C-alpha cells in the first residue's frame, strides 16, 4: 500500500477523535453529527468569533466614534 492510497487523517476539532478525510465521511472534519452540532452551537452563541476592526458609523469621523457620549 502506498502513501497515495491512504486517506489523510485529522482530529475532530470538538472531541479529538481520529477522522479519515474521505468523501463518504459526511461530517468531516468532525467525527459525528453530534460534534458538528456542538461546533455550530458554539458559533451561534458567539463562543467563536472572527476578529474584525471596528469601523465608525457612516457619517462619523474617527474622532467622533472614539468620544464617549
UniProtKB/Swiss-Prot annotation:
Leader sequence residues: none
Superkingdom, natural source: Bacteria
Cofactor: Zn(2+)
Annotated Pfam families: YacG
Keyword tags: Metal-binding, Zinc
Protein function: Inhibits all the catalytic activities of DNA gyrase by preventing its interaction with DNA. Acts by binding directly to the C-terminal domain of GyrB, which probably disrupts DNA binding by the gyrase.
Subunit structure: Interacts with GyrB.
Protein name in UniProt: DNA gyrase inhibitor YacG
Species in which this protein is naturally found: Thiobacillus denitrificans (strain ATCC 25259 / T1)
Amino acid at each position: 500500500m502506498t502513501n497515495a492510497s491512504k486517506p489523510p487523517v485529522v482530529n475532530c476539532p470538538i472531541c479529538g477523535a481520529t477522522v479519515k478525510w474521505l468523501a463518504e465521511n459526511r461530517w468531516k472534519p468532525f467525527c459525528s453529527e453530534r460534534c458538528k452540532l456542538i461546533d455550530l452551537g458554539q458559533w451561534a452563541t458567539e463562543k467563536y468569533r472572527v476578529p474584525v476592526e471596528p469601523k465608525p458609523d457612516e457619517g462619523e469621523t474617527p474622532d467622533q466614534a472614539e468620544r464617549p457620549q
